[in-house]
Structures are given as structure tokens and as C-alpha cells.
Amino acid sequence: MDLFPLARPLMSLMDPETAHGLTLRALRLGLGPTRRAPDPVSLAIDLFGLHFENPLGIAAGFDKNGEVPDAMLAMGMGFAEVGTVTPLPQPGNPRPRVFRLPVHRAVINRLGFNNQGHAALKKRLLARRKRPGILGVNIGANKDAADRIADYEAGIRAFEGLASYFTVNISSPNTPGLRALQNKAELQNLVARVLAARKGKTPVLLKIAPDLNAEELGDIAEVALEQGLDGLIVSNTTIAREGLVSGVNANETGGLSGAPLFPMSTAVLRDMYRLTGGRLPLVGVGGISSADDAYAKIRAGASLVQLYSALTYDGPPLVARIKQGLAARLAADGFAHLKDAVGADVNL
């Protein structure tokens, strides 16, 4: 059942965070739509020892506390990523902290890693551990942590065996000083400690910011390849505001997501594919709201893609539209499989 067309007019009048809470509640009650047909074979891809039926996933931030991953998978997502989760519960920044920019099909948030902590998420994931589907856990650090890297190590230890993969989130603009962990020396230490915290081989991906210069991107690519990260997620929200018209909410502080992020995040994706020589799987995220957007990310180097903000404007039907359109674009360009199109627009 898809109630979004009926609920959208009312929800658009609500505070965005309140509306999102109602969305999660509806999904918990089983009121979300379910996929009715299998995905086209051309959309399947194997990465990290995992088989993805399609490359479209829900980005972290939608389901911070792991309340509805199975509802998102049932909706037709190829994978679901929960979090960001920190060791201890924290309330995040004061409300209001999420702002719509409808004229730009964008959102600004300064949530600040609000979440219920490791224990609450672990309890939920233990309860669903035998269910099928690829589930990533996005781990972060508490705002007041004395040793933030230790918080990431704790995330690995807490969810190994429950997560299909990990995302190390060091690129949120809403936790003061967090992005400094992207600096080369800090990053080398972080990656070494996080990878050493694993007992097994659960894939570890790093989520990076779009607001990085060429030297910083080069350093991240070098560290990722040399130290054996399994992949990168490109990218988080941006602190830039170029192209936004002045108006309601345009000057709010926080991370900007949605359509205005697409050009910047795709450019960084393309650069990272080139810098890594196509040897490191990349997940493209930032401003995807159509099959054309998803296909552009793939041709720029993404093996998987994620969306979130566009769902707040277009609702669950967007998932099927993107998958159907993506399969059609692959066929039109002569690609039998998704993997054949990855990086097609990048000269290595």
C-alpha cells in the first residue's frame, strides 16, 4: 500500500523532522509499498563478496536507528544503510534542524548525529539477523568523545556479524571537527585502527565530503588504496551554497543535500574514480532524483548509488522509476550488465 500521494499535501505543511517521524512509523506498521516484480538481470552486480539485485540503496540518515531496513528492502531497494549510529545515545542539535528548499528540491540539515546509540541498534539488528537483504551500518563518533577513532573501533566491534558492510562517516559537517579526520595523517591512523578492529572480513567503506580540494582527494585515494579500504561513498552533504536563490531556509547552516549537490558530488565521484584507477568500488550519492541522475553517477564511476532527499519530494514510486529507467538506458547504450557501464565517461 502506498499512502504517499494521499499524505504528501499534509506532510509538506509539517516540520520536516516531524513528517519524517510519521513516515518511519507508517513503515513500521507495514504501510509502505512492496516490489511486485523481480529486478532486471542487467541491474545486478557483485561487490565486496555480496550480490546486489540492483544498485539502488537508501542512504544513511533516513533510518538512523535501524527501525525500517526491511521495509526499504521490500520497497525495492537493492540495499539499505542504517545510521549514523554512535556508541552512546545523543540528542543532536536543537530543533528546528531540518529545512526544506522546495524550489531547489533540496534539504538542509544540522541534525548532529542524533541517534539511540549502539545498544538500541544492536538489539534491533539481532532481532532481524536471519532476514535476507544487504544491510550496511554507518558508524560515527559521539560529539564529546575524547578519542573519536575509538568510537569507530567500537562500532566495528558492536556490529560485526550483523552488518553486511560498514560505512565510516567522517564527513558530516554537523559534528564540530569531525571532517578533520579526512586529513592524511589522521586518516591513516583512523583507517589502520578501524581495519585492525575487525575480526573478520566485513567490508569497510569510507564516506567523504564533497568540499575537498584536489590535494585532499588525492590523499584519500592514496590512503584508501594503500591501506586496503573496500570502497568509498561519494559524497556526504555540502556546506557550499552556490546556486541557491535567497529565500526561505536558503541561509540556514548545515549540510545541503538534494538536487544542488548533484553536480559537485558527481564531479568528486569522477575525480575519485580517476584517482583510484577504477580499482576501488565507489558508491555515488548526492542529488539523485531520476534514472538519468543514477546513470550519470554510474558512468562517472559508481558501482552502486544511494538516494534520500528525492524521496521526500517524490515518495516511494521513485524507486521503481529509477530502476526501470536505468535498465532502459543500459540497454539503449549496449551494456548487457551494469558493471560494463561503470566509469564509461572517465578517461583513466
From Swiss-Prot:
- Alphabetized UniProt keyword annotations: Cell membrane, Flavoprotein, FMN, Membrane, Oxidoreductase, Pyrimidine biosynthesis
Annotated SUPFAM superfamilies: FMN-linked oxidoreductases
Q: Which GO terms describe its biological process?
A: 'de novo' pyrimidine nucleobase biosynthetic process; 'de novo' UMP biosynthetic process
Q: Which free-text remark accompanies the cofactor? A: Binds 1 FMN per subunit.
- Classify the protein's membrane topology as the record does: Peripheral membrane protein
Name the coenzymes or cofactors required: FMN
Q: Which PROSITE patterns match?
A: DHODEHASE_1 (PS00911), DHODEHASE_2 (PS00912)
Q: Which reaction does it catalyse?
A: (S)-dihydroorotate + a quinone = orotate + a quinol
- Pathway involvement of the protein, from the record: Pyrimidine metabolism; UMP biosynthesis via de novo pathway; orotate from (S)-dihydroorotate (quinone route): step 1/1
Query: What InterPro entries does its record include?
Result: Aldolase_TIM, DHO_dehydrogenase, Dihydroorotate_DH_1_2, Dihydroorotate_DH_2, Dihydroorotate_DH_cat, Dihydroorotate_DH_CS
Residue ranges that the Swiss-Prot or TrEMBL entry lists as coiled coil:
none
GO terms (molecular function) for this protein are:
dihydroorotate dehydrogenase (quinone) activity
> Where does the UniProt annotation place the signal sequence?
none
Residues given in the record as substrate binding sites? K64, N109, R110, L111, G112, F113, N169, N174, N236, T237
Q: Which locations, inside or outside the cell, does it occupy? A: Cell membrane
Q: Could you give one GO CC term from the UniProt record? A: cytoplasm
Give the positions the UniProt entry annotates as the active site: S172
For this protein, the record's Pfam families field holds: DHO_dh (PF01180)
Q: How does it assemble?
A: Monomer.
Per its database record, what is this protein's job?
Answer: Catalyzes the conversion of dihydroorotate to orotate with quinone as electron acceptor.
The UniProt entry's sequence similarity note says: Belongs to the dihydroorotate dehydrogenase family. Type 2 subfamily.
Q: What is the name attached to this protein's record?
A: Dihydroorotate dehydrogenase (quinone)
What is the source species? Parvibaculum lavamentivorans (strain DS-1 / DSM 13023 / NCIMB 13966)
The organism's taxonomic lineage, starting at the top: Bacteria, Pseudomonadati, Pseudomonadota, Alphaproteobacteria, Hyphomicrobiales
Q: Which gene encodes it?
A: pyrD
